C-alpha cells in the first residue's frame, strides 16, 4: 500500500491530528537537531498529494495542531506554493511574517509543472490561494526560499523526448532553476535515474569546474558555499591595519543557521580574535558581501573563520586549503 495515500490513510481525520500532536511533542524535544519537518503526514508517502485530507480546512487544522509544539523554533514545509498561501495571508507575506513555514518540492524536473507544484493559470485570474503559472510560482518560491531552506527530490521526466520536457538535458537550465529556487538540499537516493544522468553529464562550466559533472557541480552548490574573493589591506595609521574582505556565497541558498565571522591573528606568543559579522546566515545565495574592520598590527598569520553560533561548529570556506580556518596572509613587520 506504499504510495497509495487514499487507501492507506486512516478513516478518521482526528487520528491524523493525534499523530501530529505526538510528532510535535518529539520535534519540540529535538528542535536543535531538526532543520525542516516536511509535510503533514497525509497523502502518498506523506508528501501532501493524493489524499482525502488536503482541503483548505484540513490543511489549516493540521497546521494549527503542529504550531502548538513547533512555534517559530522548528521549520515546517508544505508541498506546494498554493498550500503555503492557504496558510499565510497575502498581507503577512508582504510583511514577511512567516518565519516558520516554507516549501518542499518532491517533483523537481518531473514535468513542466514539477508534478503539480505549479499550475497553469496566471496569478491575476487564479487568486492568492490557487496554483499559479510556472513562471509566477518560481518567482514566488524564489522569495520564500531566500529565508527558508527549500529542497526535495529531483525526478526523471516521464517522457524525456517531448519538446517541453527537455529541461534536464540542459545543464545550464538545470543550474538556473536550482539557483532560482535557492535549493538547500535534495534526496540522495531518489530519483536515481536523473542523478545517474547528472553523473554522466558535463556541468558545462569553465575554470575550476572544467571537466566536472553536473552531479558534482550541483552537490557542491546545494545550500551555502562561501568563497573569499578579495582581500585588501590598508595602513590608515601607525600600528593599525584596515582589512576589507569580499565574500561571495556561490551556493544556491543561505546558511539558515546563526553564524559568526571572525578574524584571527596568531603567532608563537599570542593569539587575538575579533568578531567581524554576526549576520553570516543572511548571506544569500548568489550574492557578494563586503566586510571591513580595523585592528592593531601584530606579527604573525592572519585567518578568517566562520563558526555556528549555537555550538561553535566550524563552517568551512570553499577556498582551497581552507580546512577549519582560511589563511589570508602573514604580517612580518609592524
Where are these regions (language model features)?
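Substrate-binding cleft and catalytic face of glycoside hydrolase catalytic domains
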Residues: 1-12, 38-45
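Alpha-helix N-cap and loop-to-helix initiation/capping positions
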Residues: 7-18, 53-58
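Acidic/aromatic-lined carbohydrate-recognition and catalytic surfaces
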Residues: 14, 18, 29, 34-36
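Short amphipathic alpha-helices and their capping/turn segments at secondary-structure boundaries
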Residues: 22-29, 235
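Catalytic-core regions of glycoside hydrolase
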Residues: 33-195
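Catalytic cores of secreted or luminal carbohydrate-active enzymes
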Residues: 170-231
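Extracellular/luminal regions of secreted and cell-surface proteins that mediate adhesion/ECM remodeling
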Residues: 218-334
Amino acid at each position: 500500500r506504499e504510495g497509495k495515500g487514499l487507501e492507506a490513510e486512516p478513516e478518521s481525520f482526528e487520528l491524523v491530528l493525534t499523530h501530529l500532536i505526538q510528532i510535535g511533542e518529539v520535534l519540540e524535544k529535538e528542535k536543535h537537531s531538526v532543520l525542516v519537518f516536511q509535510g503533514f503526514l497525509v497523502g502518498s508517502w506523506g508528501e501532501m498529494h493524493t489524499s482525502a485530507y488536503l482541503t483548505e480546512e484540513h490543511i489549516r487544522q493540521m497546521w494549527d495542531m503542529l504550531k502548538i509544539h513547533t512555534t517559530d523554533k522548528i521549520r515546517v514545509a508544505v508541498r506546494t506554493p498554493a498550500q503555503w498561501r492557504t496558510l499565510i495571508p497575502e498581507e503577512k507575506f508582504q510583511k514577511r511574517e512567516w518565519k516558520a513555514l516554507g516549501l518542499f518540492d518532491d517533483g523537481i524536473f518531473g514535468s513542466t509543472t514539477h508534478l503539480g507544484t505549479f499550475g497553469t493559470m496566471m496569478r491575476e485570474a487564479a487568486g492568492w490561494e490557487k496554483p499559479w503559472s510556472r513562471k509566477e510560482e518560481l518567482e514566488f518560491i524564489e522569495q520564500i526560499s531566500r529565508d527558508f531552506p527549500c529542497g526535495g527530490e529531483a525526478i526523471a521526466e516521464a517522457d524525456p523526448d517531448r519538446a517541453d520536457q527537455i529541461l534536464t538535458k540542459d545543464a545550464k537550465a538545470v543550474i538556473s532553476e536550482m539557483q532560482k529556487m535557492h535549493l538547500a538540499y535534495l534526496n540522495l537516493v531518489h530519483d536515481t535515474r536523473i542523478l545517474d544522468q547528472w553523473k554522466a553529464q558535463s556541468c558545462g562550466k569553465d575554470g575550476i569546474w572544467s571537466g566536472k559533472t553536473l552531479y558534482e557541480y550541483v552537490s557542491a552548490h546545494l545550500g551555502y558555499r562561501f568563497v573569499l574573493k578579495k582581500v585588501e589591506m590598508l595602513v590608515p595609521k601607525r600600528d593599525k591595519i584596515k582589512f576589507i574582505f569580499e565574500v561571495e556565497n556561490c551556493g544556491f541558498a543561505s546558511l539558515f543557521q546563526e553564524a559568526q565571522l571572525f578574524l584571527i591573528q596568531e603567532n608563537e606568543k599570542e593569539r587575538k580574535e575579533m568578531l567581524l559579522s554576526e549576520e553570516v546566515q543572511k548571506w544569500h545565495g548568489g550574492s557578494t558581501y563586503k566586510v571591513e574592520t580595523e585592528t592593531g598590527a601584530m606579527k604573525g598569520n592572519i585567518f578568517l573563520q566562520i563558526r555556528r553560533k549555537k555550538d561553535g561548529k566550524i563552517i568551512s570556506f570553499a577556498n582551497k586549503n581552507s580546512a577549519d580556518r582560511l589563511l589570508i596572509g602573514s604580517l612580518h613587520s609592524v
